[in-house]
């Protein structure tokens, strides 16, 4: 190791971040549990968008498993073995959730785009069987990229404070970590382009048909588009701006101590935004899933509003 590895206190002063991670965890676990209950209670019609949302919810539960461990480790009260477990397992779960979320949000955008721009046609990609198949492929692909980070042997280093996960990695582990980060950035860029193009096509179609009385509710469609796009930008874009420079500081390509500390703090701040998708996803379920929306109405609305919502849902299903 270089001297900067010994004397640069990169991994300190994390306590302020932990309170925000804890808040995200509390809101997220409540929202995810309610979403699970709603999807189980309501017999969904297994449209493509519902399949993608259920996969998104499953990925969110991985994040709820990982966040408590990260919080304890960042508070500095975790035993040494838990720190090692976090570096090998739970940190990877956070990134598995992140890239599954990015990919499934892209498929949700594609599905919405095809529904609104080609409402009279059903493409192969819109069939539930295809959605299940592609969801399986996505899970396998992301796990294939991430799981080796859990399995590659690590160094047996002496217990100490101010230690980062990279210090546990041997040379092959460091190289795989670097490769993984570049692959994940490529995934982010490609699926971001898909989301942007899909949403632009939808907006163009809505604009062309704004005077058509038979066209679906334009305002509702635009809200859905803006919801997905805004949530995506807030959660994932800042993190990926920081990701590559921070990775270079981890591998000591960037050696200046103050720069490394700044990049680490920026990474933690933007990672907080990224995991906050756990809080935004239940809002997404509400706007995109009839089953979830109906269950929310039944649970929290007055009997009169519940009856009106059921009648509206029945009309939508018969349409």
Curated annotation (Swiss-Prot):
Membrane topology, record value: Multi-pass membrane protein
Residues in compartment: Extracellular: 1-21, 70-89, 154-181, 246-268
Residues exposed to the Cytoplasmic side: 43-48, 111-132, 203-224, 290-319
MF GO annotations: G protein-coupled peptide receptor activity; G protein-coupled purinergic nucleotide receptor activity; G protein-coupled receptor activity; neuropeptide binding; neuropeptide receptor activity
Gene Ontology biological-process entries: adenylate cyclase-modulating G protein-coupled receptor signaling pathway; G protein-coupled receptor signaling pathway; negative regulation of myeloid cell differentiation; regulation of feeding behavior; regulation of sensory perception of pain
GO CC terms, sorted: membrane; plasma membrane
Subcellular location: Cell membrane
Tissue: Expressed in both T-cell subsets and natural killer cells, while it is undetectable in B cells or CD14(+) monocytes. Expressed in peripheral blood mononuclear cells (PBMC) and Jurkat cells (at protein level).
Family: Belongs to the G-protein coupled receptor 1 family.
Function comment: G-protein coupled receptor for Big LEN, a 16-amino acid neuropeptide produced from the precursor protein, proSAAS (encoded by PCSK1N). Acts through a G(i)-alpha-mediated pathway in response to Big LEN. Big LEN-GPR171 system plays an important role in regulating feeding and metabolism. Also plays a role in modulating fear and anxiety-like behaviors in the basolateral amygdala. Big LEN-GPR171 modulates the mu-type opioid receptor signaling and antinociception. Acts as a negative regulator T cell function.
Name this polypeptide is given: G-protein coupled receptor 171
Species in which this protein is naturally found: Homo sapiens
